[in-house]
């Protein structure tokens, strides 16, 4: 299985992990670039709008995903099932990642 090395920084903690890519991934580099771009956009929005609730953010992400699933040429239910499975695996990948404190915390 292909793995994408990825790093997240949250609350003075650095997490290095490997995200399990789908077996039919065409370009792991683009997966990483798109992910990084979307995460940065969300982070910038949250910094400008600190009262944004997690619920509102997750609804916005759900709308984004629903839109992309709808306009894709694939069967919606199969894509949603794949996304759910990949999200669960992604959470496991992050949990298994190497965590290290950064800064003076």
Give the positions of each predicted feature:
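Solvent-exposed interaction surfaces and binding hotspots enriched for charged
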Residues: 1-105
């Amino acid at each position: 299985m292909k793995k994408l090395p990825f790093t997240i920084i949250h609350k003075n903690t650095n997490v290095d992990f490997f995200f399990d890519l789908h077996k039919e991934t065409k370009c792991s580099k683009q997966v990483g670039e798109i992910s990084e771009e979307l995460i940065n956009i969300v982070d910038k929005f949250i910094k400008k709008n600190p009262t944004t609730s997690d619920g509102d953010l997750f609804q916005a992400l759900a709308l984004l995903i629903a839109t992309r699933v709808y306009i894709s040429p694939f069967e919606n239910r199969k894509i949603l099932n794949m996304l759910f499975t990949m999200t669960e695996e992604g959470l496991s990948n992050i949990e298994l990642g190497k965590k290290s404190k950064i800064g003076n915390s």
